[in-house]
């Protein structure tokens, strides 16, 4: 199996590209390697579909646990449905690829990236994105590439190119940027409340590196003797577009300038104009070119009408500076925010509305055992904060079957989750697992940013001590040549007919999440910087409205939320608390009706709806793990009697034995002659034998009522730090 391997020196590392060896029947394939990470990426094209008006592109990212030397934990020991992070990586490949294919292309396209080996120093996702571009170029598919992606981290004051998983976790920024020779085409980022300027500089830093990878791809094609297939727009019939422009321009323009109408009224007015045009065309002669063209292509009229509407709306924005709802370019829609809209059985709730977009978010507090276990290639194995996003059909006035979340729902949920993560309290101060669910009740653009705002409201209502409240806004863009307008808080039609969807979330201090998608082949960093800076006053305006509903997290939790107690024990004593076969900890939970989690570090978390029960469980565990010294005096009750002695519970869950010879100074024939089960006695620790058993004595120890002293207080347990 012959193949060619090209090496690229990139930021002090070697990236190896192997072509012609793997997947010979795929349209194009490349194995991208860096360190011990290896990703096989293929691109395949099949015949075109009739009667569709979209690009049927599928991008898949496949993880194989053998890549990390692991066997799946499922019953069948086989990978099943792609985990969430794999789905997000598939979207990461799709988003910069999709705008680079020609608008007329209707062939089935599929890009599959498979992670074959994973080095924790080299995450596979950005290699997969770059590999998708190479495989597509090798397949001879019309494509406005090359395209490449890099990750940028921030450690201290220094940007790090393609950081390791550990560096990502330690840093204040995790930014992925993809670009073409025309500019940046995709941005995805999470930041620790970073100033706008830091994020802009990171994007610029990343794009400079992207340009190196683009040159490397061009050189690869040259070395392989492959000529890139550039998209050429086929000749299209202009009779129908010209007819609609003549017949409908005035009517459409009048509708777009009725700023006081609702979305529904505008949509119905445009539909009426289109229906009138269709009726007029149907009245033309049977051999008329316009009638023949629309009859042979059922989607031609609709697509041409949509294109005309798009052109007129864009012209209105570029020339008049007015949007379809009359807002200025930097104006935010009317905002409404409420906290605590549901009964307190729901731990926290918030209702956020911006224009016609409405999101209901709920927050639920759980125990450490509620954390989500992640069975994928990522080094982190659990999630303590989860955000789930639901988009039912009624939110856009439609009907369709209700199914499990798709890629869009997963992606939007992950973005809103990432926006909140940097402001969540530390685990040792707030040990709850938190789940937020955002229900989109009405959608007219920017539902993901509405979910960010709703999440903040619900978390504050639940009493989660956020470091700072977070809001978000979606920015848009209209570009005709060098004429550019940036739009604040875009609504549905502006997203659909515009060139960019740029979501920015953050606190007053700085940015926590970014996501930018383009419909054009790239933007200069300068324009992206303008959009980021224009988003800040919008975010702060939205945040101000939210804080009118709730300005600080509630002091008390819902009475229906679990109460958690956390403290630390010696990790070497974890086995003592658990007991043989888990008997000890099971007995504590049954006795106190609590839920107990113990981490390997020795952190114990007790969950209960009854504070007294949690306190009791803590005392038992502290008793089990408290060190007992010879000579200490304790008061306790007789728990059981055997022929040779009696057992005393000297601390919660911890017993010692009084040998019959230690019950009295005088000779004792029968244990029951001195003590009975339930008697309260004061004992001294006589010795602790080499098996850890505690031997007690009553001899020489004053009992209550005859001058006995107070029981020594247990040694305090070290607080969490």
Swiss-Prot record:
Recorded source organism is Parasynechococcus marenigrum (strain WH8102)
Catalyses: RNA(n+1) + phosphate = RNA(n) + a ribonucleoside 5'-diphosphate
Give the subcellular location. Cytoplasm
Keyword Glycosyltransferase: yes or no? no
Q: Does the keyword Lipid biosynthesis apply?
A: no
- List the protein's name: Polyribonucleotide nucleotidyltransferase
Q: Which residues form the KH domain?
A: 562-621
Instruction: Provide the alphabetized UniProt keywords.
Output: Cytoplasm, Magnesium, Metal-binding, Nucleotidyltransferase, RNA-binding, Transferase
Similarity annotation: Belongs to the polyribonucleotide nucleotidyltransferase family.
Q: Which Gene3D superfamilies match?
A: GHMP Kinase, N-terminal domain, K Homology domain, type 1, Nucleic acid-binding proteins
**Domain S1 motif residue range list:** 631-699
Question: What EC number(s) does the entry state?
Answer: 2.7.7.8
Q: Which GO terms describe its cellular component?
A: cytosol
Instruction: Give me the residues that bind Mg(2+), please.
Output: 495, 501
Task: Assign the protein's first listed, main location to one coarse class.
Answer: cytoplasm
Query: Which SMART domains does the UniProt record give?
Result: KH (SM00322), S1 (SM00316)
Q: Name one GO molecular function term.
A: polyribonucleotide nucleotidyltransferase activity
- Cofactor(s) named in the record: Mg(2+)
One GO biological process term: RNA processing
Segments carrying the region annotation (Disordered) are 698-721
Concerning Pfam families, the annotation shows:
KH_1 (PF00013), PNPase (PF03726), RNase_PH (PF01138), RNase_PH_C (PF03725), S1 (PF00575)
Described purpose of this protein according to its UniProt entry: Involved in mRNA degradation. Catalyzes the phosphorolysis of single-stranded polyribonucleotides processively in the 3'- to 5'-direction.
**InterPro entries named in the record:** ExoRNase_PH_dom1, ExoRNase_PH_dom2, ExoRNase_PH_dom2_sf, KH_dom, KH_dom_type_1, KH_dom_type_1_sf, NA-bd_OB-fold, PNPase
